[in-house]
Amino acid sequence: MSDKKGKVYFIGGGPGDPELLTIKAKNILEIADIVIYADSLVHPSIVDYANPAAEVYGSKKLNLEEMTALELKAASEGKIVARVQSGDPSIYGSILDQMRILKSNDVDFEIIPGVASAFAASALLQTELTVPGVSQSVIFTRLEGRVPMPPREQLKDLASHGCTLLIFLSITRMTKLVGELREAGYPEDTPIAVAYKVGWEEEQVIRGDLTDIAKKVRDAKITLSALVMVGAAFDPNILDMENVDSSNLYSPGYTHLYRSAVANSK
């Protein structure tokens, strides 16, 4: 065992585009002794930033015990471990179990946030997730599958709020997804965008509504790595709509901590 204390970094690798990797994440990759990356989800070019002398492992075939064994062994030898996740580790990143094991073994760890696919997709669609007068709330969720949802978190219940919905890990169950949106009272013309592999070379956006989005997704043969985005914020004509409220933040007639309202302004 080394006298030098090792450390594990949980790194958000972003949605795919290596230019969306944070500077801090890049810096850690360049000094890490061990790199464990989600090779089924993280763009391979992200690993190109790794220290040339680093041991690199793909995690798609590793279970929790195997992964944490690598992390614990490296830490006991005073090494730096970069555990690279896709997007941001805090959103469906499955890192809590690893952190518990590290904590129980007195191993230091740190989370380095990344650009989540939801935000990269919003940028790709050239919209905001929170549009004044349309939706000021965002729900991150998924359909119930093999992993059950907690009570009161079924999609039909969450969708009843009518706010912006970002639905992860559900692309293979679009018919069920649309059915739950209908059950929640969404109109048939509700805008839906499906963002596939945002930031990758094969990036694709499919637009539709409740009447056709399931068929469009099936026809495109998309079964993985896609985010379903639901709500008026994703209307393809959002930039041309006249009935969308303007933000008060920069309105001449709005007073806030750093600026007084201009007299007689609307």
Language-model features: locations:
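Class I S-adenosyl-L-methionine
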Residues: 1-116, 120
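A generic local structural motif
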Residues: 20-24, 43-44, 68-70, 126-127, ...
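A contiguous loop/helix-start segment that scaffolds small-molecule binding in enzyme catalytic cores
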Residues: 2, 6-8, 77-81, 137, ...
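Short secondary-structure boundary/hinge segments and terminal tails
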Residues: 46-47, 67, 92, 120-121, ...
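Active-site catalytic pocket residues across diverse enzymes, especially alpha/beta-hydrolases
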Residues: 50, 125-129, 181, 185
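Class I SAM-dependent methyltransferase SAM-binding "motif I" and its flanking Rossmann-like core
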Residues: 6, 17, 88-90, 95-161, ...
